[in-house]
Each structure stands twice: as C-alpha cells, then as structure tokens.
From Swiss-Prot:
This is Probable tRNA pseudouridine synthase B. Could be responsible for synthesis of pseudouridine from uracil-55 in the psi GC loop of transfer RNAs. One of its GO terms (biological process) is snRNA pseudouridine synthesis. The keyword Transmembrane does not apply. The lineage of its organism: Archaea, Methanobacteriati, Methanobacteriota, Thermococci, Thermococcales. It comes from Pyrococcus abyssi (strain GE5 / Orsay).
Amino acid sequence: MARDEVRRILPADIKREVIVKDDKAETNPKWGFPPDKRPIELHIQYGVINLDKPPGPTSHEVVAWIKRILNLEKAGHGGTLDPKVSGVLPVALERATRVVQALLPAGKEYVALMHLHGDVPEDKIRAVMKEFEGEIIQRPPLRSAVKRRLRTRKVYYIEILEIDGRDVLFRVGVEAGTYIRSLIHHIGLALGVGAHMAELRRTRSGPFKEDETLVTLHDLVDYYHFWKEDGIEEYIRKAIQPMEKAVEHLPKIWIKDSAVAAVAHGANLTVPGIVKLNAGIKKGDLVAIMTLKDELVALGKAMMSTQEMIERSKGIAVDVEKVFMPRDWYPKLW
C-alpha cells in the first residue's frame, strides 16, 4: 500500500534567521565550557538522555532506574508516557533537570495502531482521518493526571502508513498534551464504527528523535560500567546529550561574556548585553539565552520583540525564569 505524501513538520522544525546586533563581540576561550567539550562529570551534570522507554514501567519508574544506574540525585522526564507506551522519553539529569520545560512548545510525534470495530472502505478512512488535522477539542481521559476540562489541541499532521482490514497504522504529529487514545476514539466515532488504540510508540519529542542518540536502559548500564570500571568515557558521552540539545528549537538570544555572570546570578537580560538573536521573537515568547560558545545560560520570557531589541539601546529584553549557567563559569564583570 503506498503511503500518503505528508509534510511532517513540527514546531521544532522551524528554521530561524540570526540577526547580528554587535559584530565586534568576542568570547574568551578561558571561560565556560562549550557543550561538546565539557569534562565527563560536567557533561553528565548538564546532560539529557534520549531514552527509548520500554513498554511496562511508568515514566516515573524509568527515571528512578536511571538515577540508580548513573548514581544521580536528580532527574526529570519531558512528557509522561503511559506504562504500555514505548519510545522517545527525554530525561534531563542533575543541574539540567528543569530544561524539560523547554520541550513543551516543541511538538511530539507518535506511531499508533488503531483497531476499528467495523469494516470501513479505505478511501473513507483516509478522508475522515485527514479531517482531524488542525485544531481539535479534547477532554483528558478518566485516568489522566490532569483535570478533565475541555481544551483545544493542535494536530500538525496525520500520515497513514498501512491499512490492513480493520487495523490502521498511522503517524501523527501533535501539540504537547494531546491524547492519542482520545484522538483514536473520536476518529472511530466519526467513521461510525468505533475504534480503540491497540499500540502506541512516541517517535519524537521536539528535537529528540529515533536516531543514533536514542539509548536503552541496558545501554546505560553497559556504558556507565565501561566508564567507571574501564575508564572508557566515549560511550556514556554519546549516550548523554548536552542540555543545549533540549533548546535547539527555541528562539535564542546570544549574549556578551560580560553579561553572562549577571544573568547566572538571576539578573534579567538587558539590551546592552545582546550580541545576536533570532528573527521573529515576539513579546511573551519563551526564549533561550546563550553564550557565544553556544552554552545555555537561562530560559526566560521575552519582554520585547526582535525588532525592539535591535532598535533599542536599553531596557529589559528578557525576564529570566530559569538559570542553568553556574555562577562561577564566567567572571563578574559588572
């Protein structure tokens, strides 16, 4: 069966132009640690794992296992997967734990197996499922951890992969907080026969995909052993991504070395500290503040648009909400 031609684009795939405000600014190589050059201990402390969650355990249990495997105090996951669901589960470690907030606007992708409760012609299945692209209204399932209020969610694309009788295998890209089980239930109602979700796997969570960075719990056990027992850090380094991976999709503002320590101490970012920034930033957007070495300094809410940040010479550009940069990586220069 030929696959439908579908453009599979999530918010995380948006390409952003970079606008330079200060073309004379440089960074001192003595300060900070470029994401790919951190000592292994810091790499782990400021890292994120692209985990292939197995079906069976809860997301919380999987995170607890990772903490035991890697001997960590803190870890957090980005987007809960139900016990029976497998696939991409970003797990942020130690000092990077709060970076999972950045994944909320990035979009998610799943491959689902829908079982119809009656026979339906293929052309009708395709036509009806196409109608579910765009904004839909959902109520969280009874067993959900959130209040069961009606809410709007966006379906970015639906791609039918295979139809075999009453079984429909499809790929779907959705906004965070979209319930695929509920989506399938409503598709079944629209088809007039009813349907239920037979299987589900998450294949993307923003910048985290089913690619060479995806690792299993067994991989982590082996790689940690290689490092601790044999002194081989190559594998654990590949298994853990720098926390900057989790903000790849966000609009960014790069700042001067002289502004880094102030933001690391919790100060809001002011316009004079900006070197370059992405086009299209709107007031209220979640933005990532970066060093000129592409280190994540903080997340915050834009208080100006890109145009205003370029044109103005003073004022608060970003209300800083979460700081990730240690206070001692860059010197106080204020």
